[in-house]
């Protein structure tokens, strides 16, 4: 089965959401998210973004589906749908099966899991994650959704070429300090 990358912004306490939206507004993080999830080395391919229904519904209608990527929504409530840029499936297993077969096995370069917490947890539990691209925000936002399943003892921090030659650069925007980190899941740890 194919592996995926996970991309997430998280506060100091592991919070990733509050009242159905991101509890912070960091333009540089949004730009990073778009750049990383769209970037392909083979220009004949594109990436897929995999998300849960709540994550899908948190995206403004005018920005759905996320441009330049195949959007796959996991939902037990939405009816199954399929178009060129948007597919609804009822399970992670169904999504991964779809992406592991033609035409997607040949046309999708990277699968990006963009959340939310339940979808992140499921992929981590099923050992489907290769890399984690983490925006670490150095503040607690009293979030109501947390990512609890990240076990950094089973990962190693790697160079994040998408940001700079330094993997530990701290940025600041709107009074918030944050960094972009990249972690590789170590299989036999």
UniProtKB/Swiss-Prot annotation:
Keywords in alphabetical order: NADP, One-carbon metabolism, Oxidoreductase
Top-level division of the source organism's lineage: Eukaryota
Biological role: Key enzyme in folate metabolism. Catalyzes an essential reaction for de novo glycine and purine synthesis, and for DNA precursor synthesis.
GO biological process, one term: folic acid metabolic process
Gene Ontology MF terms: dihydrofolate reductase activity; NADP binding
E.C. number: 1.5.1.3
Reactions catalysed, as given in the entry: (6S)-5,6,7,8-tetrahydrofolate + NADP(+) = 7,8-dihydrofolate + NADPH + H(+)
Domain spans labelled DHFR: 3-185
Presence of keyword Magnesium: no
Protein known as: Putative dihydrofolate reductase
Residues the record lists as binding NADP(+): 9, 15-21, 53-55, 75-77, 115-122
A Gene Ontology cellular-component term: mitochondrion
Lineage: Eukaryota, Metazoa, Ecdysozoa, Nematoda, Chromadorea
Enzyme class per UniProt: oxidoreductase
Family matches, as InterPro entries: DHFR, DHFR-like_dom_sf, DHFR_CS, DHFR_dom
Pathway(s) the chain acts in: Cofactor biosynthesis; tetrahydrofolate biosynthesis; 5,6,7,8-tetrahydrofolate from 7,8-dihydrofolate: step 1/1
Binding site for substrate: 29-34, 69
Species per Swiss-Prot/TrEMBL record: Caenorhabditis elegans
Family that this chain belongs to: Belongs to the dihydrofolate reductase family.
